A protein has these predicted regions:
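A short beta-loop-alpha structural element at the N-terminal edge
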Residues: 2-16
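Conserved GNAT-fold acetyl-CoA-binding loop/helix
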Residues: 15-40
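A short helix-loop-beta-strand connector motif used in the catalytic cores of GNAT acetyltransferases and
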Residues: 39-51, 78
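Conserved beta-strand in the GNAT
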Residues: 51, 57-66
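Conserved acetyl-CoA binding element of GNAT-fold acetyltransferases
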Residues: 75-86
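Conserved acetyl-CoA-binding loop-helix of GNAT-fold acetyltransferases
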Residues: 84, 90-103, 130
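Conserved active-site alpha-helix within GNAT-family acetyltransferase domains
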Residues: 95, 119-137
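Conserved GNAT acetyl-CoA-binding A-motif
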Residues: 98, 106-116
């Protein structure tokens, strides 16, 4: 398995995985919109995507968005999306993607990474804790959905 940094030319490898990821969170299937969304993020340099590959087959991806910690005066990365194809689960793909994201944060001089996950997504929580992530017990999260 190889972890590569995705480029716009890789969009057709990522789109089916991204569509499946969205379906996991109960969004309707829409491969073309998924493809367009990923293409825009990559061509506009709005996100960084790492792709797990094996024999020209995409196994999973992690997508990071840049943010800033104002008080710390440093950058950080939002690990917004992590998905592994069902046929490739329990083979270390998710862990390899998490490690590559962490390595990238180090390479960019970032303060760190953060993520959020569904409270009932126990497999993901187990993976994050295995990779050394700590659940925040200090801060509340607030959302205001506009549309």
């Amino acid at each position: 398995m190889e972890i590569i940094r995705a480029q716009a030319k890789d969009v057709d490898l990522i789109a089916p995985l991204f569509n499946a990821y969205r379906q996991f969170y109960k969004a309707p299937s829409d491969v073309e919109s998924s493809r367009q969304f990923i293409f825009e993020r990559l061509t506009k340099d709005e996100s960084v995507i790492f792709l797990a590959m094996e024999d020209d087959r995409a196994l999973g991806f992690v997508q990071l968005y840049p943010l800033f910690a104002s008080v710390a005066l440093q950058s950080l990365w939002l690990l917004n999306d992590l998905f592994v194809d069902s046929a490739a689960r329990n083979q270390g793909v998710g862990e390899a993607l998490m490690k590559r994201a962490e390595q990238f944060a180090h390479e960019t001089g970032s303060r760190g990474l953060f993520l959020r996950t569904a409270t009932d997504n126990f497999p993901a929580q187990k993976l994050y804790e295995k990779c050394g992530w700590v659940r925040d017990e200090t801060f509340y999260r607030y959302d205001k959905i506009l549309r």
